[in-house]
Amino acid sequence: MPIIQRIFARQILDSRGNPTVEVDVFTDSSFGRAAVPSGASTGVHEAVELRDGDKEFYLGKSVMKAVENVNTIINDELSGMLVTEQSEIDNALLQLDGTPNKSKLGANAILGVSLACAKAGADYSGLPLYRYIGGTLATQLPVPMMNVLNGGAHADNNVDFQEFMIMPIGFDTFSDALRCGAEVFHALKSLLKSKGLNTAVGDEGGFAPNVKSNEEAIELVIEAVGKAGYKIGNSTANGGLGDGQVMIALDPASSEFYDTEKKKYVFKKSSGQELTSEEMAAYWESWTEKYPIISIEDGMAEDDWAGWKLLTDKIGKRVQLVGDDLFVTNTERLAEGIEKGVGNSILIKVNQIGTLTETLQAIDLARRNGYTSVISHRSGETEDTTIAQIAVATNAGQIKTGSLSRTDRIAKYNELLRIEEQLDTEAIYPAKKAFRV
């Protein structure tokens, strides 16, 4: 029987050189390892990432307390349990912590254990993780959101919006879609060089040039698609996706430039323009009429429910509106959004909620209410590829895991290539069917 014999955690470094938690789970016949990601722009409603705060060690970002919690409290509680009983393990972790936001043990400690247990269970079962979680129906590869140009909190430039992404929707296989993304990435690099712009990359591997405006940023991405030999899609103003091969997705991370005192969106990095919620919603409406935008994540601030409702009423029938800081992978926040009729999609970040079971519950709630799910990385990543497995396990249809550079991002794409190869003729690439708008 796959009984947990030992759970051991260590402190490792993420892609930004900050400490994070890695967990090993040992049973009498299997092994699982998971590393925990970390975000730069984090929602106030996220589960608590436990850090030590001692400025003499990693500038206060050390996670040795979370590591200690795994090696003592959690190890003592879970040793002897069946590693294949995922929901029981996760429930035990929640009860052991006992707080609504996992602040006692730390979401980083809890998540590392939850995911490592799932991997040990898969190892015991002789199955890849996506089959172990999703069963025989786990056959759908995700359409990637590829972050090719960075701004906001992810880059030291004068662009307000955090991510400008491409989505290859006009292809039959994941491997062809990935090739498109890589070729557009290199075309964008050449384009930036030709204009004398910086080709250094941000946290997620996208370029971070100092361009004149937010408009110039999206126009550079659109131009690069054409230079790579691909057809850019049309504006969704009249509904439908047309016959374009590539569409644009945005993550403005609007909470980052929302002034809670003024109750206005302030473009601090560029023009200094200040917009009310009504004006911000109208701004995005105008952009979707002008540009081939299929998805906007966090187009409004995390607690601007009225603004989210305005935006959803304006463009929610033709543009995917993804809640990240709004929903924080939390079923209670998502249920509130569903009731209020805001957004139509949820970003799924495993470390926002803290256990695999809760993550799967959020995806299920979204699906039952007609919301799409986008499985996502964080800006601080590791070589861990669990999110690629979860994307296929849940048939989510979309994944957001960075640009076509930096090994911490490429690791997820390479894992999806391997899964596509394993699935062979069963593999499905949803293309335009990944969207419900």
Curated annotation (Swiss-Prot):
Matching InterPro entries: Enolase (IPR000941), Enolase-like_C_sf (IPR036849), Enolase-like_N (IPR029017), Enolase_C (IPR020810), Enolase_CS (IPR020809), Enolase_N (IPR020811)
Cofactor: Mg(2+)
Active site, renumbered: E204, K349
Binding site for Mg(2+): D251, E297, D324
Gene that this polypeptide is encoded by: eno
Subcellular compartments: Cytoplasm; Secreted; Cell surface
Catalytic function, reaction form: (2R)-2-phosphoglycerate = phosphoenolpyruvate + H2O
Record has Metal-binding as a keyword: yes
The keyword Transit peptide is annotated on this UniProt entry: no
Cystine crosslinks: none
Superkingdom: Bacteria
GO terms for cellular component: cell surface; extracellular region; phosphopyruvate hydratase complex
Protein name: Enolase
Gene Ontology molecular function: magnesium ion binding; phosphopyruvate hydratase activity
EC number(s) stated in the UniProt entry for this protein: 4.2.1.11
Cross-referenced PANTHER family: ENOLASE (PTHR11902:SF1)
Positions of transmembrane segments: none
Its biological purpose: Catalyzes the reversible conversion of 2-phosphoglycerate (2-PG) into phosphoenolpyruvate (PEP). It is essential for the degradation of carbohydrates via glycolysis.
